[in-house]
From Swiss-Prot:
GO cellular component: cytoplasm; plasma membrane
Region annotation (Domain II) ranges: 83-124
Keywords: ATP-binding, Cytoplasm, DNA replication, DNA-binding, Lipid-binding, Nucleotide-binding
Predominant subcellular localization, coarse grouping: cytoplasm
PROSITE patterns, sorted: DNAA
Presence of the UniProt keyword DNA-binding in the record: yes
GO MF assignments: ATP binding; ATP hydrolysis activity; DNA replication origin binding; lipid binding
Subcellular compartments: Cytoplasm
Name of this chain's protein: Chromosomal replication initiator protein DnaA
Protein family per UniProt: Belongs to the DnaA family.
Organism of origin: Rickettsia felis (strain ATCC VR-1525 / URRWXCal2)
DNA-binding listed as a keyword: yes
Lineage per the UniProt record: Bacteria, Pseudomonadati, Pseudomonadota, Alphaproteobacteria, Rickettsiales
Stretch list, region Domain III, AAA+ region: 125-343
Length: 463
């Protein structure tokens, strides 16, 4: 906990002391990895009517703690002070509270001697953006994150996760975690020798060593390290000579209790054109899958990135990005950067409409942008009514029901507000749209045929 801050306020000193005990208990119970991920930046704000108010750094962290740990935190508070009846977690400081920040000592890169940095370091191959502090943790990457932290924090000893094998699709955070391991070790254990390298570069260096008759030097370089991290191991599939050298390097390091971290786009068992003896060894330690992102994780990543960049983005834009850019984290962050850059260069305000226009090509490559007009045309055609009936006030069932379905689909498939949807349907107000959506939802509970019909319409529109 030496790297954390304790936040004090000018009110409720007794509760401040209790919070310091609770924080220590959370650290002791969950360990450093989980503590740093979720609790280290949660601050005590104040107490009011036997309610303790805590402040989380982002909405994502707040919601995660509420869903996973709120009861544990409350019980710990009550253990020290039974007058506490509830806790509240917010994301903004309350007016009238002044905070005193007590900084506890923390080691930074500036504290590391220049000779330490210059002696066979890997800083030139590590991306400064990829640290544990700015890696957003969620259900899809929890295991991989915890395992990577354990490797980094092993303080010279080999972790139980040896080798650590991280696998998953492109842009989901595998490389980020490997860089974070490198930064952490070099910051906290600078005497340890670490090499991070792509499998492609490993192969090219091996080929160069063969050509220049420097194989012995090559072997000494890679077999004398404390931690060897090889990214995208799938690259050596089908390359027999490189596989042979990797196999012997792997064995030497593992036999000498040195740590290996390997990433891949698939699990060891799914690798083709690679020797079985290598495949089996890759699964010796911990195999951690980095899953595709969830909406909640994408929201957390965006909030974290926006906080780092110190910019203001409207909530509807953040929700839109989290909903529409679903392929990987790299593309999500790229989309956010593009929106911010466009605003900076054109001096235009960031709005949902501007965002949709800026990202039109990217969104089209992921999924076509569905408009209310698209929905109206498709539903009108499906039910054999005139397109003009969508904006009319006709109450005949054969017209009103398709119109209600179109409103329901407009809410489900577009980011438009109820008021905006209403305007597209003959300037109807938002309560009319709300009634239509509620009516369709009620019908869907029991009408299997309608449910299938709407599912079919959704597929047609999305494809």
């Amino acid at each position: 906990m030496s790297t954390n801050q304790i936040i004090l306020t000018d009110q409720g000193d007794n509760y401040v002391n209790v919070w310091s005990h609770v924080a220590q208990d959370l650290y002791n119970h969950y360990g450093e990895t989980l503590y740093n991920s979720w609790f280290s930046k949660v601050n005590f704000i104040e107490s009011s009517l036997n309610t303790v108010i805590l402040c989380a750094p982002t909405n994502f962290v707040r919601d995660w703690i509420k869903s996973k740990y709120s009861m544990v935190i409350l019980q710990l508070f009550q253990h020290y002070n039974n007058t506490i009846k509830s806790i509240e977690i917010i994301t903004k400081e309350l007016p009238g509270t002044t905070q005193t920040v007590i900084e506890l000592p923390t080691k930074t890169f500036a504290d590391i001697g220049s000779s330490e940095l210059n002696s066979e370091n890997i800083f030139s191959t590590l991306d400064v953006r990829f640290t544990f502090d700015n890696f957003v943790v969620g259900a899809p990457n929890e295991l991989a994150y915890a395992a990577a932290r354990a490797v980094a924090e092993s303080s010279g000893a080999v972790s139980e996760s040896n080798p650590l094998f991280l696998y998953g699709g492109v842009g989901l955070g595998k490389t980020h975690l490997m860089h974070a391991i490198g930064w952490y070790i070099k910051q906290n254990n600078p005497s340890r020798k670490v090499i991070y390298m792509s499998a492609e570069k490993f192969m090219y260096q091996f080929v160069k060593a063969l050509r220049n008759k420097e194989v012995i030097s090559f072997k000494e370089k890679f077999r004398s390290v404390d931690v060897l991290m090889i990214d995208d191991i799938q690259f050596i599939c089908g390359k027999d000579s490189t596989q042979e050298e990797f196999f012997h390097t792997f064995n030497t390091l593992i036999d000498n209790n040195r740590q290996m971290v390997i990433s891949c786009d698939r699990s060891p068992s799914d690798l083709d054109n690679i020797e079985d003896r290598i495949k089996s060894r890759l699964g010796w330690g911990l195999v951690a899958d980095v899953h595709s992102t969830t909406y909640e994780l994408r929201l957390g990543i965006l909030e974290s990135k926006i906080e780092q960049m110190n910019v203001k983005i409207p909530k509807d834009v953040i929700d839109f990005l989290a909903s529409k850019i679903v392929s990987n984290v790299r593309e999500l962050e790229g989309a956010l950067n593009k929106v911010i850059a466009h605003s900076n260069f054109t001096l235009k305000e960031i709005t949902l409409e501007n965002t949709q226009n800026i990202l039109r090509d990217l969104l089209r490559s992921n999924e076509r942008i569905i408009t209310v007009e698209d929905i109206q045309k498709k539903v009108a055609s499906r039910y054999n009514i005139k397109l003009s009936d969508m904006s009319s006030s006709r109450r005949l069932r054969e017209v009103a029901r398709p119109r209600q379905i179109a409103m329901y689909l407009s809410k489900a498939l577009t980011p438009k507000s109820l008021a905006d949807i209403g305007k597209k349907f003959g300037k109807k107000d938002h309560t009319t749209v709300m009634h239509a959506i509620k009516k369709v939802e009620e019908l869907l509970e029991n009408d299997i045929e309608l449910r299938e019909e709407i599912n079919l319409l959704m597929k047609i529109l999305q494809n």
